[in-house]
Amino acid sequence: MGYVRVIYQFPDNLWWNECTNQVYYAQDPMKPERLIGTPSIIQTKLLKILCEYHPAPCPNDQIIKALWPHGFISSESLTQAIKRTRDFLNDEHKTLIENVKLQGYRINIIQVIVSENVVDEADCSQKKSVKERIKIEWGKINVVPYLVFSALYVALLPVIWWSYGQWYQHELAGITHDLRDLARLPGITIQKLSEQKLTFAIDQHQCSVNYEQKTLECTKN
């Protein structure tokens, strides 16, 4: 099965190739000149929903539903997601992602290029296979070092997961996780717990939660 190549042009010759999920500057969209990088999972979802609504603004509730489908997220979390995405896109003047008062957010797209041919998966090397992703529904899981801080919940902000040999960042602002719920999930083995770190195994991945740095790092075995 292949993928249709869709490339979005933003102001200042900034491009987002949805197929490879790469953001870069270029005169020719097929010849990246300066790579910005790969958007995080939350940033990718945000770009997709804003592009789907373009040229209309996307309502805040629709953005929240697209970014965090499994749980309630405050408006502050949405604001932080917008800010981080603007920072990633070098949108310091807030002209690429605009805040439309009482309507939501709108993305400034110059043009959209859609390939007429379906490309092979090899051409979309950054496409992440669902089967290769860590199978955790983060909106339904709680992680807390209850043996040490029984009443303290730890908010995990950036989460890194492993897929096709690449690191991807996933921001989970505002979500807390309960270790007891995590341990009940099928396929998860809690291996080590301390004041600073939790280690567990899931779906052929070795994962480590660092409470101080608020990160989760997973590598494929």
Curated annotation (Swiss-Prot):
* GO cellular component, as recorded: plasma membrane
Q: Where are the transmembrane segments?
A: 143-163
Keyword annotations of the record: Cell membrane, DNA-binding, Membrane, Transmembrane, Transmembrane helix
Query: Which stretches hold the DNA-binding feature?
Result: 5-109
Query: Cross-referenced Pfam families, in alphabetical order?
Result: Trans_reg_C (PF00486)
Quote the annotated effect of T20S.
Answer: In strain: Z17561
Any S-S bridges, and between which cysteines?
none
- Give the membrane topology, semicolon-separated if more than one: Single-pass membrane protein
Write down the SMART domains for this protein, in alphabetical order. Trans_reg_C
> Which InterPro entries does the annotation name?
OmpR/PhoB-type_DNA-bd (IPR001867), Sig_transdc_resp-reg_C-effctor (IPR016032), WH-like_DNA-bd_sf (IPR036388)
According to the UniProt entry, its GO molecular function terms are:
DNA binding
Instruction: Please provide the Gene Ontology terms (biological process) for this protein.
Output: phosphorelay signal transduction system; positive regulation of DNA-templated transcription
**Main subcellular location:** membrane
Query: What is the recorded function of this protein according to its Swiss-Prot or TrEMBL entry?
Result: Involved in TCP pilus biogenesis.
What is the name attached to this protein's record? Toxin coregulated pilus biosynthesis protein P
Organism listed in the record: Vibrio cholerae serotype O1 (strain ATCC 39315 / El Tor Inaba N16961)
Identify the gene encoding this protein.
tcpP
